[in-house]
A protein has these predicted regions:
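Intrinsic-disorder/low-complexity, polar/charged segments
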Residues: 60, 136, 191, 244-245
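C-terminal functional modules
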Residues: 230-275
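A short, terminal or domain-edge coil/loop segment
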Residues: 82-94, 212-216, 238-239, 263-275
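Short, solvent-exposed coil/turn linker segments
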Residues: 108-114, 197, 218, 258-261, ...
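Acyl-donor binding region in acyl/amide transferases
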Residues: 1-70, 175-239
Length: 275
């Protein structure tokens, strides 16, 4: 856990903090919410950026409703409440013009996933990453329990994606908030099935009434995200990793590392309760 400290401009506090963060022989430190100042400090002592994960994707389902939802509460008080009602038919019309850009992938279905099932499947779905969390059932259950307490973004929800044989090929974890934004924490997939998993997820999120969905980019997801219309990327925060292990550094550079969501900081109430 790295906090924010203040020091006099002429003092050596910043340098001492940086030196204290230098990795030990076999340690790995990472952060997925680093500011430019923090990123520069970490790079000065050997830290590396994790490819793509500084980006947040935003997939819009109902453009006018999503735009109104982004307006500040202060501004919304000055807007006729009827605009929110007007947005629905306008978005429906835009949806017809847009056409069927969210067709469900053939043979894939989205199903409810219990926490015990998620605890059983999650390690298998990230096993192909060279650097990944070695979650035990107790550890992952503890994380899920804490994340579920964060209700500011919506209801903590887990869904599985199954193929025509009813085998689980992926799952996604998100804060559900129909009529608002779905905040996606994790998208887990067997290697090579990411495009189908993403397509099924976006179809489900639109069908359940969300205006838009947001989540973190990852190298393995870029092909599937790139196929989506009405999707944009924006810088969110730097994702950084710090280690002295050469093999781990190589994996970081090529993006063969799984961090973020439950394996990161986005679920923490510290990240959203004070915004």
């Amino acid at each position: 856990l790295l906090g924010v400290f203040m020091t006099n401009r002429d003092s050596a506090g910043a340098a001492q903090l940086n030196l204290g963060l230098r990795p030990k022989k076999a340690s790995l430190s990472f952060c997925d919410s680093a500011s430019p100042t923090s990123a520069r400090s970490l790079m000065a002592i050997g830290g590396k950026t994790i490819p793509m994960q500084n980006l947040e994707w935003v997939r819009t389902f109902r453009p006018l409703g999503a735009l109104l939802g982004r307006l500040s509460p202060r501004l919304l008080r000055r807007i006729d409440p009827g605009l929110a009602t007007l947005a629905r038919p306008v978005d429906a019309f835009l949806g017809r013009l847009r056409g069927g850009d969210l067709e469900s992938p053939a043979g894939l279905k989205v199903q409810e996933m219990s926490i015990p099932d998620f605890l059983a499947h999650a390690p298998r779905l990230i096993a192909h990453y060279a650097v990944r969390p070695l979650w035990s059932e107790d550890e992952l259950g503890w994380l899920v329990g804490l994340a579920a307490q964060n209700t500011r973004l919506g209801a903590f929800t887990i869904r599985a994606i199954v193929d025509h044989t009813s085998a689980t090929i992926g799952c996604f974890v998100y804060y559900a908030s129909p009529g608002r934004t779905a905040h996606v924490l994790n998208i887990l997939s067997l290697p090579g099935r990411e495009v189908g998993v993403l397509g099924a997820m976006f179809r489900h999120l639109e069908d359940t009434g969300h205006l838009e969905a947001r989540g973190r980019a990852q190298p393995a997801l870029m092909a599937g995200l790139g196929l989506q219309r009405w999707l944009v990327f924006r810088h969110r925060a730097f994702a950084m990793a710090l280690t002295r292990v050469p093999e781990v550094n190589d994996a970081i550079v090529r993006g063969d590392i799984y961090v973020g969501g439950l394996a990161g900081e986005d679920w923490s109430r510290l990240m959203c309760d004070f915004g």
